Amino acid sequence: MDVKVLRLGHRPSRDARITTHVCLTARAFGASEVILSGEEDPKLMEGVEDVVRRWGGPFSVVYRRNWQGVIDSWKKDGGEVIHLTMYGLPARDVVPGIMDNGKDKLIVVGGARVPGKVYSLADYNVGVTNQPHSEVSSLAVFMHMLLDGAEFDLKFEDARIEVIPQARGKMLREIDDGD
């Protein structure tokens, strides 16, 4: 199952930090790609690509102006669309039915104002709680549930550095090509 994330309504002047965190969370939890819509942001995309160069992949970030075209194409190719929204059905009730159905997933996370059409285009409108909170936290919790905790065992290809877990302190290890 391939998982990609569509970030709606990105605004470089206001959303650079939160969209970067959407990208980092998507990557760390096992998505293969984030698709940005809204305004194009080459600086953000270069920053995420730098993380992938250092910490490994595979992962990419691309820009598509037409978010509806992304959704339509995804559905035409047999994938399903999951919109994370506080107005959706509880994740704990919805995720078991979609996690093992074999379909690729496009997870849609909003920006400032989500177009109403997203709610009708989505196969599932899912609430990670029905309270206001961050799209980053929604994405992390949802992906953890969807992939049944698999993010804890992910290995990233071509990583140049990795964390050596410690009870106290911080330790990184540089990875040689021969490792």
Swiss-Prot record:
Homodimer. The keyword Cytoplasm applies. Specifically catalyzes the AdoMet-dependent 2'-O-ribose methylation of cytidine at position 56 in tRNAs. SUPFAM superfamilies: alpha/beta knot (SSF75217). It comes from Methanothermobacter thermautotrophicus (strain ATCC 29096 / DSM 1053 / JCM 10044 / NBRC 100330 / Delta H). Belongs to the aTrm56 family. It is found in: Cytoplasm. It catalyses: cytidine(56) in tRNA + S-adenosyl-L-methionine = 2'-O-methylcytidine(56) in tRNA + S-adenosyl-L-homocysteine + H(+). It is an enzyme of class 2 (transferase). It comes from the Archaea. This is tRNA (cytidine(56)-2'-O)-methyltransferase. Pfam families: Trm56. One of its GO terms (molecular function) is tRNA (cytidine(56)-2'-O)-methyltransferase activity.
